[in-house]
Curated annotation (Swiss-Prot):
Gene3D superfamilies attached to this UniProt entry: 3.30.70.3270
Membrane topology listed for this record: Peripheral membrane protein
Similarity annotation: Belongs to the complex I 23 kDa subunit family.
Catalytic activity from the UniProt record: a quinone + NADH + 5 H(+)(in) = a quinol + NAD(+) + 4 H(+)(out)
Binding site for [4Fe-4S] cluster 2: C73, C103, C106, C109
E.C. numbers: 7.1.1.-
Protein role: NDH-1 shuttles electrons from NADH, via FMN and iron-sulfur (Fe-S) centers, to quinones in the respiratory chain. The immediate electron acceptor for the enzyme in this species is believed to be ubiquinone. Couples the redox reaction to proton translocation (for every two electrons transferred, four hydrogen ions are translocated across the cytoplasmic membrane), and thus conserves the redox energy in a proton gradient.
GO biological process: aerobic respiration
UniProt main location, coarse: membrane
Co-factor binding comment: Binds 2 [4Fe-4S] clusters per subunit.
Chain sites annotated for binding [4Fe-4S] cluster 1: C63, C66, C69, C113
Official protein name in the record: NADH-quinone oxidoreductase subunit I
Record note on quaternary structure: NDH-1 is composed of 14 different subunits. Subunits NuoA, H, J, K, L, M, N constitute the membrane sector of the complex.
């Protein structure tokens, strides 16, 4: 009897017809994708995107040249040169470079920073035409921080209970 049923299924192409109807049902269903350049999807506050150096509200840069981010970076993508000590005993960076080609976006630099100076912001659209444009210097990082400060501060505030 089972041989007869198997022959009937083969003759009527039952698997083919059921697969065809499944494909047609999926073809005419609403698509879950978004039209990317024109529509933006949700980005988590914990998203790790383009790096930025932050400033204090008075305009002074936050980085105290402790070099913890440089020491903890597994890809060795961060290079820092510290300036001389100032009268108040603090130091600031003379040079702060990140090689974004080497960076693996692990977030260790952000976690290690005691003053929340280096952060990974919400920007994920930073494609370049040349490799040299992915070597970020201090000015580029400070410019990113100024551009994304509102979003960065909001994300840090929302993430604070989990740290």
């Amino acid at each position: 009897m089972s041989g007869f049923i198997q022959a009937a299924k083969s003759l009527l192409l039952l698997e083919f017809v059921s697969a065809f109807f499944l494909a047609m049902r999926q073809f005419f269903s609403p698509k879950p994708t978004i039209n990317y350049p024109y529509e933006k999807g949700f980005v988590s506050q914990r998203f790790r995107g383009e790096h930025a150096l932050r400033r204090y509200p008075n305009g002074e840069e936050r980085c105290i040249a402790c070099k913890l981010c440089e020491a903890i970076c597994p890809a060795q993508a961060i290079t820092i040169e510290a300036g001389p000590r100032r009268n108040d005993g603090t130091r600031r960076t003379v040079r702060y470079d990140i090689d974004m080609v080497k960076c693996i976006y692990c977030g260790f630099c952000q976690e290690a920073c005691p003053v929340e100076a280096i952060v990974e912001g919400p920007n994920f659209e930073f494609a370049t035409e040349t490799r040299e444009e992915l070597y970020y210097d201090k000015e580029k990082l400070l410019m990113n921080g100024d551009r994304w400060e509102r979003e960065i501060a909001r994300n840090i505030l929302m993430d604070a209970p989990y740290r």
